[in-house]
Amino acid sequence: NQFDILLCSNLFGDIISDECAVITGSIGMLPSASFNEKNFGLYEPAGGSAPDIAGKNIANPIAQILSLSMLVRYGMKLKKIADKIDKSVASALKAGYRTADISNNNSYLKTNEMGDVISDFLINGK
């Protein structure tokens, strides 16, 4: 809760992202951004490609959605929209919606269902 941004080289970023995954409960919760000197950014989830779960509809979409929020906030300078995206993710989690990687029971959503829930919070402000 103390830090919003960690600045480090790629090697240490890989190590730190693995450590942060333990803190958050899943690598699927970690957005990331890489910038160059001209402020051009690459926004993507902190984890790898996870080929073992590709096409199974079980990946946690939150890191991707929060990476989009970072793109909107830092790349497009649209803070209010980024805040709405962040709030939608937080609202979905607060309401108890979870994907399998962060669920502590047998009730969880698939990737597309979690995306739909977060979209619903974003569009309808639920």
UniProtKB/Swiss-Prot annotation:
E.C. numbers: 1.1.1.85
GO CC entries: cytosol
Listed Gene3D superfamilies: Isopropylmalate Dehydrogenase (3.40.718.10)
Keywords per UniProt: Amino-acid biosynthesis, Branched-chain amino acid biosynthesis, Cytoplasm, Leucine biosynthesis, Magnesium, Manganese, Metal-binding, NAD, Oxidoreductase
Reactions this protein catalyses: (2R,3S)-3-isopropylmalate + NAD(+) = 4-methyl-2-oxopentanoate + CO2 + NADH
InterPro entries: IsoCit/isopropylmalate_DH_CS (IPR019818), IsoPropMal-DH-like_dom (IPR024084), Isopropylmalate_DH (IPR004429)
Binding site for NAD(+): 48-60
Molecular-function GO terms, alphabetical: 3-isopropylmalate dehydrogenase activity; magnesium ion binding; NAD binding
Chief site of localization: cytoplasm
Textual note on the cofactor: Binds 1 Mg(2+) or Mn(2+) ion per subunit.
A GO biological process held by the record: L-leucine biosynthetic process
Cofactor section: Mg(2+); Mn(2+)
Protein's pathway: Amino-acid biosynthesis; L-leucine biosynthesis; L-leucine from 3-methyl-2-oxobutanoate: step 3/4
Protein location: Cytoplasm
Binding of Mg(2+), residues: 14, 18
Top-level class of the enzyme under EC nomenclature: oxidoreductase
Record-stated family: Belongs to the isocitrate and isopropylmalate dehydrogenases family. LeuB type 1 subfamily.
Subunit-structure text: Homodimer.
Function: Catalyzes the oxidation of 3-carboxy-2-hydroxy-4-methylpentanoate (3-isopropylmalate) to 3-carboxy-4-methyl-2-oxopentanoate. The product decarboxylates to 4-methyl-2 oxopentanoate.
Annotated PANTHER family: 3-ISOPROPYLMALATE DEHYDROGENASE
Name recorded for this polypeptide: 3-isopropylmalate dehydrogenase
Species assigned in the record: Buchnera aphidicola subsp. Uroleucon rurale
Gene: leuB
